[in-house]
Each structure stands twice: as C-alpha cells, then as structure tokens.
C-alpha cells in the first residue's frame, strides 16, 4: 500500500453518480488502444458533452496516473497495475479498496457517516478535522463533494435531500473495515516539534490494532484528548470500546460505542476500576486503591463528577449494558 497517499481526489466527467462509469470507459479505451496523449484528449472531447479544455482533461488523467490506474510509457498510455487489477476484478469492493489505499480520508468519511447523515458542509468539516493535512480552506465544499460523489458512484453512499447517508453496502464495509484495515501503514501527521509519536496504534489491554482512519475519526470526535486524564498527545491515546471488542464484534466500528482514553485510563476502564454512567458521571470501583498521584487525582478524587465528552456521543444502552457486568456497581 502506498505510504504517501493522495490528498486530492478529482471528479470524473459525466456527473456526480457516474464517476465509476467514466473510469470504466477510460480504462477500456486505454486497454484497447494504448493511445497517445493527443488521442486520449481527443477521446475525452468526443465522449463527453461540453468537455474541451486540455488542462481539465489532463488533470483527471494525471490523477489516474498518480493512483496507478494508467501509466504513461514513452508517448503512449497503458493500464497501470491498479487499472489492471480493477479491470480484472470488475467489482466495487476492489475499487473501494484501491481508492482507500491511495486516497486519504475515504474510510474516515464512511465511519463518520455511520454515526448519522451529514450535509456536505459537515462532510467538509469532518474531513478537515480528521485529516488536517488535506489543507483545503474551511468552508469550501468542492473537495468534500468530490469525495462524497466517488462513494456515491461506487454505491456505498447515497444522497437524500441535502444529506449523505450510508447504503447497505456502505454499512457492510464499515462493520468489517475497523479490523481488516488495521494493518494500514497510514498514520496521522505528527507535529515535527513533538519528540514522541506513535507509528502503530494498539490498545493497551489486548495489544489489538484498529484501522488508523477509524482511530483518527474517534480522536477527532472527542477533541483529541482523554476526558478523564486530559492527556492530549495522539500517541498516548487509545480507542476504548464500551461494549468490548471481543464480546461484541458487531459494535467494533460503532462510533457510539467508543471514546478516546489515555492508555493508562483505557487499561483501568477495561479492568473495571472505573466506569461512567448514562449521565457521563465518573463511577469508581470502591475496591480501587492506588499510590499513584495521577490515578488518585484523575479517577478516585473525581468520583461523581461529570466528564467532558460530547453530548449523545455514547448510546445509553451500551453504557447500561457495560455497567450491568460490573459486580461492584
């Protein structure tokens, strides 16, 4: 998988829901004719109404080149390794995997949509909050719209009025992706002034990896900090599941089942040393004793305090179900 994924995604000609159809046509033309650049530009002009600008056409061709759908060999264009793979497979699962491997942010958008419908302005904010390296101007929605339209064209997202929602296929992808993409080599950019950074992201208790884009989505939703300890360094934060990863696989990618905790506080939570109730108040195991000033100050001394996490970020039934398993509560 490319370690330096593309930050810019370009739209295809033909309309918002026809990106894949256009991609298929381009790949078929290239595979059949191995055209020169002039022939490829001419084919675009003859295939799409109101398309004449060479620069506009070549911007799309260069994107496909960067993503390795097509390669230029001498004066001619041929299918690249990705173009060959997708053409042979011919299914949307393969195309989505390829697009996620080569572009920043598509998986995190699918995760975010699993929490509920989003307007295009909300999509834009989500992408910038989760992936600040994308770098477009906040408030602009063109780049966000291109990402949403690629997912629409592949059948994983649909538009209802002014909102974007997951399709059934989108839900299937999200439910599996949090574990299947755990070995992705992408990680969020770290400020060069930081002396510490985490190259892999594993939970403390079970040494379990999750998809880095799922992790980035969770940290973004929780303001990049642990609400118990105040730790705000990304390399020291974990994705903590209310209903456990191992016992409730159907809720692994459910954003209303996770919160950001420091590695130490994640371990304490998973061991039942503290929990939170449906009002987001801290509840502490009466048997929990410690000589650690940090644990005393951040957990024991805060018994009954309401922690600062976004309203309705956790499903009350998940919290109730988790707490029902704690004999001391």
Regions found by a protein language model. Name each.
Residues 5, 39, 84-88, 98-102, ...:
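Amphipathic, alpha-helical segments enriched in basic
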Residues 1-183:
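Donor-sugar nucleotide-binding helix/loop cap in glycosyltransferases
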Residues 71-72, 102-111, 150-156, 168-175, ...:
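Short, surface-exposed, charge-dense and proline/glycine-enriched linear segments
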Residues 73-74, 160-161, 228, 235, ...:
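A generic structural-conservation signal
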Residues 117, 121, 171-216, 227-237:
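A short mid-domain helix/strand-loop element embedded in enzyme catalytic domains
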Residues 199, 203-214, 220-221, 231-237, ...:
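A detector for short metal-coordination/catalytic motifs
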